[in-house]
Amino acid sequence: MALSSIFGGGSPSQQSNLPTSSASSSVKDQLKGQIAQELAVANATELVNKVTENCFEKCLMAPYTSKQDTCVDQCLAKYMRSWNAISQAYVARIQQASANGDI
């Protein structure tokens, strides 16, 4: 084994196997997309868990009455309004950071 191959001085055909910047950029974009999807799933799961924990525990009691439907509907609507406001603010911050080159 020659020392040149150990220190990166191998033949040009060996060096051409390295990924190009466009290929690594594509991989980076794919990873970003996958991470964004996983975060969206995690956030949706967290929303469902919080709604279940807070709204149903607050509103549903034995014996069941129709007032509980109204309570659950209002509680769910409150969480969805809050979720939408927070999501919009988060997306705006991410877009601003991306435009500034911070991301």
UniProtKB/Swiss-Prot annotation:
Motif Twin CX3C motif, chain ranges = 55-75
Q: Does the keyword ATP-binding apply?
A: no
Q: Which UniProt keywords apply?
A: Chaperone, Disulfide bond, Membrane, Metal-binding, Mitochondrion, Mitochondrion inner membrane, Protein transport, Translocation, Transport, Zinc
Pfam families xref list: zf-Tim10_DDP (PF02953)
> Do the record's keywords include Zinc?
yes
Q: Which GO terms describe its molecular function?
A: metal ion binding; protein transporter activity
Q: Which Gene3D superfamilies match?
A: Mitochondrial import inner membrane translocase subunit tim13 like domains
Membrane topology per the entry is: Peripheral membrane protein
Identify the GO cellular component terms for this protein.
mitochondrial inner membrane; mitochondrial intermembrane space protein transporter complex
| BP terms from Gene Ontology | protein insertion into mitochondrial inner membrane
Q: Where is the composition biased (Polar residues)?
A: 12-25
Q: What is its main location?
A: mitochondrion
Where in the cell?
Answer: Mitochondrion inner membrane
The record, for InterPro entries, names: Tim10-like, Tim10-like_dom_sf
UniProt-annotated stretches for the region Disordered = 1-25
Task: Please give the superkingdom of this protein's source.
Answer: Eukaryota
Q: Describe the family membership recorded for this protein in Swiss-Prot or TrEMBL.
A: Belongs to the small Tim family.
Note on domains (UniProt) = The twin CX3C motif contains 4 conserved Cys residues that form 2 disulfide bonds in the mitochondrial intermembrane space. However, during the transit of TIM13 from cytoplasm into mitochondrion, the Cys residues probably coordinate zinc, thereby preventing folding and allowing its transfer across mitochondrial outer membrane.
Q: What is this protein called?
A: Mitochondrial import inner membrane translocase subunit TIM13
Gene name, please? TIM13
